[in-house]
Swiss-Prot record:
The chain crosses the membrane at residues 274-294, 301-321. It comes from Salmonella paratyphi C (strain RKS4594). NCBIfam families: PRK09546.1. One of its GO terms (molecular function) is cobalt ion binding. Disulfide bonds: none annotated. Pfam families: CorA. It is found in: Cell inner membrane. This is Zinc transport protein ZntB. It catalyses: Zn(2+)(out) + H(+)(out) = Zn(2+)(in) + H(+)(in). Belongs to the CorA metal ion transporter (MIT) (TC 1.A.35) family. The keyword Acetylation does not apply.
Length: 327
């Protein structure tokens, strides 16, 4: 493949444009640099910036359909061979489990053995690990190594997110054993996060597996082996997600049962109170509506005797409920 001039790739408002030095480090791309397989270029763009958008729309280095894909709407993870290059769409986790579950950041990239063009709208936090290694001189030395390191960082962030969700589920299960109900909507949000993760990480695992099996010229056997390890690791994370989704379903049933039992206990308590006070209410009502006058109304001990009668009646009903094992 022909070498590329640095001036053809330099974009003024690029997030960064670096030339890999072949020893694990990078240097800023300059116009007089020569880009080839020994010194590939990594161009990282925010496709909403005007200069980046114009470069994507006009550069002859990219096929026409690749230009649209790099600046298009978010899509599910996929990999496509485009002539001498490969178009890859990946998803990564940004932030914590308290954020919206569907806020997965899309990163699109087109690469061959000479240069890498990656685009995003929001910052991809997982790239910070790769950038840090390159700046310290311990990063990838070629395009294949770069892709493996990026996929490894994305999988690390996904695994950490899955582990956080798993810890939350364990805490919920422990609280349910103590009859503690989570706040309204908490379990639904947790379940949605798991489902969204499952939706995007399953095709991403397939992307990794395909990259491990494809005979791409810029990937060595060691790169393919590492990529297969990453696919297997993400596959284990998907198994954990499936288990967590099943556990949230069980917890939802358990929460419904706990709430139903709590309501039943309250209803039972109110029914017992009604049974205890129903006879006394009947007597007070009967005496109160007596049109011929209240019996014992002219006797000074009448009210006291009536109160004693009510206490004895309530005590008798309570004793009967206790012996009947209703209390």
């Amino acid at each position: 493949m022909e070498a590329i001039k640095g001036s053809d790739v330099n974009v003024p408002d690029a997030v960064f444009a670096w030339l890999l030095d072949g020893h694990g480090g990078v240097k800023p791309l300059e116009d007089n640099d020569v880009i080839d397989s020994q010194h590939p270029c990594w161009l990282h763009l925010n496709y909403t910036h005007p200069d980046s958008a114009r470069w994507l729309a006009s550069t002859p280095l990219l096929p026409n359909n690749v230009r649209d894909a790099l600046a298009g709407e978010s899509s599910r993870p996929r990999v496509s061979r485009m002539g001498e290059g490969t178009l890859i769409t990946l998803r990564c986790i940004n932030g914590s489990t308290d954020e919206r579950p569907d806020q997965l950041v899309a990163m699109r990239l087109y690469m061959d053995e000479r240069f890498i063009v990656s685009t995003r709208q929001r910052k991809v936090l997982a790239l910070d690990d790769v950038v840090s290694d390159l700046q310290e001189g311990t990063g990838p030395v070629d395009c294949g190594g770069w892709l493996v390191d990026v996929c490894d960082a994305l999988t690390d962030h996904a695994s950490e997110f899955i582990e956080e969700l798993h810890d939350k589920i364990i805490d919920l299960e422990d609280n349910l054993l103590d009859q503690q109900i989570p706040p309204r909507g908490f379990l639904a949000l947790l379940r949605k996060q798991l489902i969204v993760m499952r939706r995007y990480m399953a095709p991403q695992r397939d992307v990794y597996a395909r990259l491990a099996s494809e005979r791409l010229p810029w990937m060595s056997d060691d790169h393919r082996r590492r990529m297969q390890d990453i696919a297997d690791r993400l596959g284990r994370g998907l198994d954990e997600i499936d288990a967590c989704i099943a556990r949230t379903g069980i917890m939802a049933d358990e929460i419904a049962q706990v709430m139903q039992e709590s309501l039943a206990r309250r209803t039972y308590t109110m029914s017992l109170m009604a049974m205890v006070f129903l006879p006394s209410t009947f007597l007070t009502g009967l005496f109160g509506v007596n049109l011929g006058g209240i019996p014992g109304g002219g006797w000074r001990f009448g009210f006291s005797l009536f109160c004693i009668l009510l206490v004895v009646l309530i005590g008798g009903v309570t004793l009967w409920l206790h012996r009947s094992k209703w209390l």
